[in-house]
């Protein structure tokens, strides 16, 4: 029977927490800016860790520059995190941009725009009264029985 939380998953969770702290407190590179560590996938042999990060930037060039800065600093970040974790071998860190959070925010904004547009159209053309809708429903019920 497999364990509910495997060792690789536990190490991934701890690595995510330590990376977040290191990136927030210890990294002084202005090119990186504010970065969020969304998830960490650790390989089964613990030799590689794929770190999914998000930047709150919409410009793809700026995001790529920040990601390149993180990739260049990966060995230094690995050293800092290794000092905070008690592992025999520290996984090699590979940073990957995760656009799911930004896409989710974009979709939420689109839904909000549609809702606001609908409200504006209702105000412009007048809203339909509930009484009119109820009368239409009653009339359709009456006509269904007379077929």
Swiss-Prot record:
Does the keyword Nucleotidyltransferase belong to this entry? no
Compositional bias per record (Acidic residues), positions renumbered to this chain: 128-147
Query: Which SUPFAM superfamilies does this one have?
Result: Ribosome-binding factor A, RbfA
One GO cellular-component annotation of the UniProt record comes to: cytosol
Keyword Cytoplasm part of the UniProt annotation: yes
Any one Gene Ontology MF annotation carried by this entry is: ribosomal small subunit binding
Sorted UniProt keywords:
Cytoplasm, Ribosome biogenesis
The region called Disordered is annotated at 122-147
Recorded hits in Pfam families, A to Z, give:
RBFA
Protein's cellular compartments: Cytoplasm
Q: Name one GO biological process term.
A: maturation of SSU-rRNA
Question: Could you tell me which HAMAP family the record lists for this protein?
Answer: RbfA (MF_00003)
Q: How does it assemble?
A: Monomer. Binds 30S ribosomal subunits, but not 50S ribosomal subunits or 70S ribosomes.
Q: What does this protein do?
A: One of several proteins that assist in the late maturation steps of the functional core of the 30S ribosomal subunit. Associates with free 30S ribosomal subunits (but not with 30S subunits that are part of 70S ribosomes or polysomes). Required for efficient processing of 16S rRNA. May interact with the 5'-terminal helix region of 16S rRNA.
Its family remark reads: Belongs to the RbfA family.
What is the protein name given in its UniProt record? Ribosome-binding factor A
- What does the organism's lineage look like at the top? Bacteria, Pseudomonadati, Pseudomonadota, Gammaproteobacteria, Alteromonadales
Q: Which gene encodes it?
A: rbfA
């Amino acid at each position: 029977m497999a364990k509910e939380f495997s060792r690789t998953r536990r190490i991934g969770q701890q690595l995510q927490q330590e990376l977040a702290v290191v990136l927030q407190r210890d990294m002084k590179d202005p090119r990186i800016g504010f970065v969020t560590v969304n998830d960490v996938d650790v390989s089964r042999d613990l030799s590689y860790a794929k770190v999914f990060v998000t930047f709150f930037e919409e410009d793809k060039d700026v995001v790529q520059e920040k990601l390149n800065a993180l990739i260049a600093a990966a060995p230094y970040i690995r050293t800092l995190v290794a000092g905070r974790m008690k592992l025999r071998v520290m996984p090699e860190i590979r940073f990957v941009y995760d656009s799911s959070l930004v896409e989710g925010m974009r979709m939420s904004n689109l839904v909000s725009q549609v809702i606001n547009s609908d409200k504006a159209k209702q105000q412009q053309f007048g809203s339909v009264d509930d009484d009119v809708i109820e009368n239409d429903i009653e009339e359709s019920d009456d006509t269904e029985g007379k077929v």
